[in-house]
């Protein structure tokens, strides 16, 4: 087992970690996929902070810990990169996630309702709500 950090390494925002359960098999899970914020983005190309610059073909799912933007804000970019696997979250987080993503897209990306709705439609197909004390397999 290994953990690969794709964010929140030199600071606290941009949480995005890959749990590789068995490096011999395509069995990774992504834990969060958040935006970098504040001082951690100063002097850096903002587009490079949004890109998904790691391979996603062996990732079996995304586990969202909670609905703060520094934990979920890059999900639209993950979807745009071709991610099409389950997005696991608690029932409460699963209910909030589309609202948070919609707001983030309107504030930081576009007000084009067609683009926003396309992203939300794709997102809603992938969300899997998990009750507390329920295991995922």
Residues of each region from the PLM?
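Short acidic-hydrophobic, aromatic-tinged amphipathic segments that line or gate anion-handling sites
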Residues: 125-132
